[in-house]
Amino acid sequence: MSRYRGPRVKIIRRLGALPGLTNKTLKSKPGYINQSTSNKKVSQYRIRLEEKQKLRFHYGLTERQLLKYVRIARKAKGSTGQVLLQLLEMRLDNIIFRLGMAPTIPGARQLVNHRHILINNSTVDIPSYNCKPKDVITIKDRPKSQSIITKNLNSFQKQKIPNHLTFDLMQVKGLVNQIIDREWIFLKINELLVVEYYSRQV
């Protein structure tokens, strides 16, 4: 299954706020009822499916990519769900987003694909690059790159930078301090349901 490129409002209307996908929010009218879920008993499968979809759309992954991360998480030590979230949070495109250098994860992915981003002074154009503690993220020293990032930093409302990252606004430089803690993952998600959804596929 390919990466979703359709209307983003349609997705957040169904799944709720997904800040990585879009910074738009829905304002329901007073007394609004979601007709797709009202007066219906929601199955456990659907609940798990929707949690999985939240994760996939928020981080902008294909089905195959998400399944790959689940398999890696299952082989690692610790809680599979927590490891899964940490793997996704440490992707370069997500780190760029969390630093406030792009308004969304798709926007961050575009910056990486267009070779605007440096890791430890080397160009990295792979959005899925796994960032590690002590990695330094900077912008390529060319007018176009600097202009795009400066515009993003000045134009979009900033989320609080999580404790595993540091950002120097004057130098436009980010630093990965550590692997992210679960409490700093601000997506409203039950990762255990995602693991359960994939339990027969891994």
Curated annotation (Swiss-Prot):
The keyword Magnesium does not apply. Disulfide bonds: none annotated. It is found in: Plastid, Chloroplast. Its main location: plastid. Keywords: Chloroplast, Plastid, Ribonucleoprotein, Ribosomal protein, RNA-binding, rRNA-binding. It holds the Pfam family S4. One of its GO terms (cellular component) is chloroplast. Signal peptide: none annotated. GO terms for molecular function: rRNA binding; structural constituent of ribosome. This is Small ribosomal subunit protein uS4c.
